Design a protein with these regions (language model features):
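Conserved catalytic/switch belt of AAA+ P-loop NTPases
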Residues: 108, 133-150
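Catalytic acidic motif of RecA-like/P-loop NTPases
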Residues: 122-128, 133-140, 156
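Clamp-loader machinery-focused feature within the broader ASCE/P-loop NTPase space
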Residues: 2-130
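Charged, glycine-rich active-site and insertion segments that engage polyanionic ligands
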Residues: 1-55, 73-76, 144-145, 154-262, ...
Length: 334
């Protein structure tokens, strides 16, 4: 989607109906907390929702709880230049104490032109201990006329003391239909068949699906599967093919971890297929024409070993091991 997708109001976003009801109830009662924690999977719209909520809070049209999209405040939100909206994002993978201190200093002043200043702290699960302790002081004694919206990945740990001082709003994966509709609004709009494949493989995360689309990850994945599914390929006899494929994977750089997640989905589907179980993600679309019929017949032991090999590769990347070497070892183990 664009910066605000179908509009600049959170009520116009696709999915997350439970989150909408919780926020609208707060609007209706006039009892907004001093801090929200939007917690859910990566790429399902938490930050986009937060921006839409900020726009709605400061909209000059008070006839409805959403944002009108046309008043002075909404136009500033749309252009990304609203003086009473702050965004704090991780720097080099973490929110640092200097960022929190600067935020606290800004909160000591009243909003410039709105009733409420909104601060969005993205990915607070990346926050270092000293930064988290500094934030706790603000959450314990929040300044008036300010709303903090924290976002966190549900698979990552957040300090219980932070959670207890926020109203938690759960976010969930979107339906395949909603994910396809969101992909249709992307500049790189995929064809319907590709959109449904992306929606299935992203497991309802439009952000992840968009990443797959922009990086042409599906095409790379098909090449990798074509190599590892080739029954004639022998790592001892044809190492050059595996090494060249590893180079292609390593070129994904910071997008290599989500690529490995995609590879795990395919291996998991192969495992479910081998067990004759129906609950699969539909990754058969990753197979090149003819691959399904000539693919290697893998035992359950081999499929489990493959999943373990990908898990090891993920851990090695997290330790900043050489990407190309990690990919080479992985492919030789698959």
């Amino acid at each position: 989607m664009g910066d605000f997708g179908r509009g600049i109001c959170f009520t116009e976003l696709l999915g997350q109906e439970k989150a909408k009801k919780l926020i609208l109830r707060s609007f209706a009662t006039g009892r907004l907390p001093h801090a929200f924690l939007f917690k859910g999977p990566e790429g399902v719209g938490k930050q986009l929702f937060a921006r839409g909520l900020a726009a709605a809070l400061n909209c000059r049209d008070h006839d409805h709880p959403g944002a009108c999209g046309s008043c002075v405040s909404c136009r500033k939100f749309r252009s990304g230049n609203h003086p009473d909206f702050m965004v704090i994002s991780p720097e080099k993978g973490a929110i640092k104490i200097e960022q929190v201190r600067q935020m606290c200093q800004a909160l000591s002043y009243p909003p410039y032109e709105s009733d409420t200043r909104v601060v969005l702290l993205e990915d607070v699960h990346t926050m270092r201990a000293e930064a988290a302790n500094s934030l706790l002081k603000t959450l314990e004694e929040p300044p008036t006329d300010n709303l903090l919206i924290l976002t966190a990945d549900s698979s990552r740990e957040v300090l219980p003391t932070i959670i207890s001082r926020c109203q938690v709003v759960p976010f969930h994966y979107l339906s395949e239909q909603d994910t396809v509709r969101i992909l249709a609004e992307q500049p790189e709009r995929p064809d319907p068949e590709a959109a449904h494949l992306l929606a299935r493989l992203s497991e309802g995360s439009p952000g992840r699906a968009g990443l797959f689309l922009k990086t042409e990850m599906i095409g790379i994945m098909k090449k990798v599967i074509s190599v590892i599914a080739d029954p004639d390929l022998d790592g001892d006899r044809d190492p050059g093919t595996l090494l060249k494929t590893a180079e292609v994977m390593a070129e994904l750089k910071e997008n290599l971890p989500p690529f490995l997640g995609l590879l795990k989905i395919w291996l998991r589907d192969q495992l479910m297929l081998a067990c004759d179980l129906p609950k699969r993600c539909g990754s058969e679309g990753l197979m090149q024409t003819g691959d399904a019929g000539r693919g290697k017949s893998r035992s359950l032991r081999q499929l489990f070993a493959g999943l373990q090999a990908v898990n090891r590769a993920e851990k090695e990347l997290a330790r900043n091991c050489n990407r190309t070497l990690v990919c080479e070892v992985l492919l030789f183990n698959l």
